[in-house]
Amino acid sequence: MKFFASCAKGLEYLLADELLALGASRATATISGVNVEGELRDAQRAVLWSRLASRVLWPLTEFDCPDEDALYAGVAELPWDAHLSVGHTLSVDAHVSGTAITHARYAAQRIKDAVVDTMRRQGLERPSVDVENPDLRLNLSLRKGRATISVDLGGGPLHRRGWRMAQNEAPLKENLAAAVLMRGGWPRAYADGGGLLDPMCGSGTLLIEGALMAADVAPGLQRYGSDVPSRWRGFDRDGWQQLVGEARERDRVGRAALKQVIHGSDMDPHAIRAAKENAQVAGVAEAIWFGVREVGELQTPPQATGVVVCNPPYDERLAADAALYRRLGDTLQRVAPQWRASLLCGNAELAYATGLRAGKKYQLFNGAIECALIVCDPIAVPRRTPLAAPTALSEGAQMVANRLRKNLQKFKKWRAREGIECFRAYDADLPEYSAAIDVYQQADGDRRIFLHVQEYAAPATIPEADVRRRLNELLAAAREVFEVPAERVALKSRERGKGGSKYGRFEQRNEIVHVREHGALLRVNLFDYLDTGLFLDHRPLRGTMAQQCRGRRFLNLFCYTGVASVEAAVAGAASTTSVDLSATYLQWCADNLALNGLAGSKHKLVQADALAWLEAERAHFDVIFCDPPTFSNSARAEDFDIQREHVRLLRAAVARLAPGGVLYFSNNFRRFKLDEEGVAEFAQCEEISPRTIDPDFERHARIHRAWRLTA
């Protein structure tokens, strides 16, 4: 049987892992939740034990729902006397999108009407509605004409643990607090004898959740007490009581063994008083030390290692500023340099303001507030050890080093004039050393240099031993010239096999580096994929478009990681719309926007096949960028071939231009031939390829071609 566990956006993969650990047969992350395969007992166990889920929904029926009449009819077909006892109360939560029914409250009312009418026809008493504490809470998910009616097995939001008696302003939800603790590695740290510290603890949510986690206390125990979460007639009461009995025994053992290694402080005495009250109700007051203390007065904790968790203030009411975050970062480096930190910051800029180097970064949501979670391990990065004395380069490596130095000198004035921090330093300049070397300078921290080396396919006539030797010589030269250690060199090397040469497996480091281009901060991943998230050859075209976008509407088709959208937004675009079929790339685009403080309704992300979307869209734009792939054969859209489809694509894009608007079209297909006669039927077209190539790509100027189109 399949059921659904919802969660805050950003917690999906953590929740999937948690549900698998709790016994689910399969758990697949989706947007704001997890699709789960398991029995009713697995779903009820999730209600009792999940620290991350918002709700656990057990489906009753699913049906096509084009309109309100179909909704009523689909609900009325259910035998409601098998689900709702006489005299029991009812409530319905509804979520609708992409359907003819646009109002969730109206949809909920139609479901209530159908249930009431059905029970009346059966000669049963009319059920009453109780929004706060119903016996049966139903959930409607109506998306794109498909309705799912489910029982909310938990009877309401699972983040309510039952211990919160008092709170300061802007509380943190308990399931998000659990995510901060899990991402920070608190369960393992506690098992290893480490401590837990929150220097801005507020009402104590993170520390209390951490204590309950360490004590192996089921989150649902205090929430439900001796009651059952739902009085749905299908609820397995005997199975629930067995789960509760097992949880109570684990609770008894865990609380008895709970170590006093948790410390919290806050400058607000009212917040500390609330935290103590909450800890008392949760039964962990003896395990947590609370004190009134300003961040800068924080003392070195008694444990040598542990986890610092913190949710510094960040919304408008609390008027947080970068100075507070900087003070927090400085203090943590002073008092707990070898600890790990898991900090839930208001946004990426505030996270950057801490001055801490984040090994991992996550985008989370505290209610409707978008946040940035950074994990630093350790808090104080060890000082860089000097690079080992370089060994003498071979003759071949010395040739590469000389060419690299020559190129750097050639690009020096151009880079200084244009503020170029990421560029191509070498592009098979020496044919026998056939690779590209791209330089990425970190925009934050100590502005480290990273190298991205992409090996080109060698002719089959060259012995494999020579190919490997030359690649090693090229790498040695690059490390010496740029003075970078091997761990900051991302190598995409080719392996020979059946079918010719192909790229081997990449590293899976999940390491994000922030770089800067045209004033915009951008996230790149140099190690995990063939592409980094930033196509350097399009740099001048992005700059041209950004200059033209101030106060104008920008459309980015096949947007990839959204770099052009971000740079347009930073330059003052009135709005940006970014379209791509890939949810992964759209999330990357969203992260790039957030990194620049640009997330919001002005910057729209659309997951769709770009051509189909264009032909259905009616909005107009002032500047459009269209950079399609050469081929695409996604299972979710029609096969795409740029040579075959470009006239149709450009016609649809030009139709979306506002008066005076301009379309920039680019692609990298080396054998591409523009159908000039076909395009001339609807647009004026000028090839601008030479103007879109910067000095670092002049050696291979046909890396892309570009055109400017107007209606």
From Swiss-Prot:
Catalytic activity: guanosine(2445) in 23S rRNA + S-adenosyl-L-methionine = N(2)-methylguanosine(2445) in 23S rRNA + S-adenosyl-L-homocysteine + H(+); guanosine(2069) in 23S rRNA + S-adenosyl-L-methionine = N(2)-methylguanosine(2069) in 23S rRNA + S-adenosyl-L-homocysteine + H(+)
PROSITE patterns, alphabetized: THUMP, UPF0020
Record EC number: 2.1.1.173, 2.1.1.264
Alphabetical list of Pfam families matching this protein: Methyltrans_SAM, RlmL_1st, THUMP, UPF0020
Any one annotated GO CC term: cytoplasm
Keywords, sorted A to Z: Cytoplasm, Methyltransferase, RNA-binding, rRNA processing, S-adenosyl-L-methionine, Transferase
Keyword Kinase listed: no
Main location: cytoplasm
Domain THUMP, chain residue ranges per copy: 42-153
Subcellular location: Cytoplasm
GO molecular function, one term: 23S rRNA (guanine(2445)-N(2))-methyltransferase activity
Function of the protein: Specifically methylates the guanine in position 2445 (m2G2445) and the guanine in position 2069 (m7G2069) of 23S rRNA.
Record protein name field: Ribosomal RNA large subunit methyltransferase K/L
Lineage, broadest ranks: Bacteria, Pseudomonadati, Pseudomonadota, Gammaproteobacteria, Lysobacterales
Underlying gene: rlmL
